[in-house]
């Protein structure tokens, strides 16, 4: 028998299980303690609730993607819109799978890698969509070139006092977003490698852990990309006003950037003990996994609301009437499949990255081409007019981008 204060406690080796006093409860050997009880993330309820939100979000977004492909009347814009919309299925389903394999901390890292790689592309595609809305670089420069950049500490432009908008400004915005498309996948691959060698744990800020360095690099990269997006919006907010840019900017930033800071906060809370860890002889859960599990559950729920907001922000209805033929019919299924193939082709991303980081950037232009109108409406006259306008805009584009202005 051992003594704790004034209360006698039975010796662990003794077969006696009787309580020494009413205030002492003795748990038989082999019974799970309170800490060994499954947490909410490990229950069927958590998987069912998250699954309901995930599959509902998938249905909403997949229908919206289908309608965009069915009414694929403006490929230069809808290509980017469809790519942005795919963030909901990828984020939601990936997070749900991570939650299902919550007790295996290796699987959720692999699932997160797929999610991380795709979110980098969303930033680029959103900026490219804004460029397309405004007609390309030459059209943007014709509106903002030479105007002074308003200096404001609130908007983060105080360091740009005395500078004016130039082609270098647009180049910086593109490069800052493209670097995120490179850094994010590299960090995702590094995470998998470090995880395989036991050098990575979510929420482990020790100097010997790869999590600390991956987080620092990612913070710098994501902050730079966010700053570039904000600078571009700050410069073109009046030009973008017909396209309801506020909701679009908010949704893209919240889905990608806020989810990152949300995960960071949960990791810090677990490190500080605000989120209890799981200590069980039957379940092996690594450090940081509980915070990552809550992050996955929250994302599953958030993607449902993101799907609703994105459905309103990137509606297909503005393109529906443009796709009707003479009989009022939309594109057949074959056209939908070919449109999807064109949307998923990353050729434009690779080409744009090469040109934006090339020393010969001044000779490069990103200019939306005017599509010839349907033959039953404009005929050959409409086609020749499109070519003449395109040639005129090309001349303007050459004059604008031959400048050696730097940002």
Swiss-Prot record:
The keyword Hydrolase does not apply. It is found in: Membrane. The chain crosses the membrane at residues 40-60, 84-104, 121-141, 178-198, 214-234, 249-269, 290-310. Residues 1-25, 369-395 are annotated as: Disordered. Keywords: Membrane, Phosphoprotein, Transmembrane, Transmembrane helix. It is a multi-pass membrane protein. SMART domains: Solute_trans_a. The modification Phosphoserine is found at residues 388, 402-403. GO terms for molecular function: transmembrane transporter activity. May activate the MAP kinase signaling pathway. PANTHER family: ORGANIC SOLUTE TRANSPORTER-RELATED. This is Transmembrane protein 184B. It comes from Homo sapiens (Human).
């Amino acid at each position: 028998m051992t003594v704790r204060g004034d209360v006698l406690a039975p010796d662990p080796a003794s077969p006696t299980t009787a309580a020494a006093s009413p205030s002492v409860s003795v748990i038989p050997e082999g019974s799970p303690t309170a800490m060994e009880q499954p947490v909410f993330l490990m229950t069927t309820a958590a998987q069912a609730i998250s699954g309901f939100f995930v599959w509902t979000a998938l249905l909403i977004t997949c229908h919206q993607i289908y309608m965009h492909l069915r009414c694929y009347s403006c490929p230069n814009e809808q290509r980017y819109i469809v790519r942005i919309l795919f963030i909901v299925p990828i984020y939601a389903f990936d997070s749900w799978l991570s939650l299902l394999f919550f007790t295996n901390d290796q699987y959720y890292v692999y699932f997160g890698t797929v999610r991380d790689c795709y979110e980098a592309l969303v930033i680029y595609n959103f900026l490219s969509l804004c460029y397309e809305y405004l007609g390309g670089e030459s059209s943007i420069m014709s509106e903002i070139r030479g105007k002074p950049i308003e200096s404001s500490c609130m908007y983060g432009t105080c360091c740009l006092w005395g500078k004016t908008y130039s082609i270098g400004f647009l180049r910086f915005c593109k490069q800052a977003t493209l670097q995120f498309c490179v850094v994010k996948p590299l960090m995702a691959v590094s995470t998998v490698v470090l995880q395989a060698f036991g050098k990575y744990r979510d929420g482990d800020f020790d100097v010997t852990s790869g999590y600390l360095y991956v987080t620092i690099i990612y913070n710098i990269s994501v902050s730079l990309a966010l700053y570039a997006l904000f600078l571009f919006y700050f410069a073109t907010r009046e030009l973008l006003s017909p396209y309801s840019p506020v909701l679009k900017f908010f949704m893209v930033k919240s889905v990608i950037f806020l989810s990152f800071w949300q995960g960071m906060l949960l990791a810090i809370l677990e490190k500080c003990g605000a989120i209890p860890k799981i200590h069980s002889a039957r379940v092996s859960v690594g450090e940081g996994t509980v915070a990552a599990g809550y992050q996955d559950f929250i994302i599953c729920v958030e993607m449902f609301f993101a799907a609703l907001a994105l459905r309103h922000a990137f509606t297909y209805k503005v393109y529906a009437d443009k796709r009707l033929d003479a009989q009022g019919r939309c594109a057949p299924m074959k056209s939908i499949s070919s449109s999807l193939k064109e949307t998923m082709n990353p050729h434009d991303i690779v080409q744009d990255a090469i040109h934006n980081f090339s020393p010969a950037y001044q000779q490069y232009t990103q200019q939306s081409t005017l599509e010839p109108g349907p033959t039953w409406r404009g005929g050959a006259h409409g086609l020749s007019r499109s070519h003449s306008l395109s040639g005129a805009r090309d001349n303007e584009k050459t004059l604008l981008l031959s400048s050696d202005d730097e940002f």
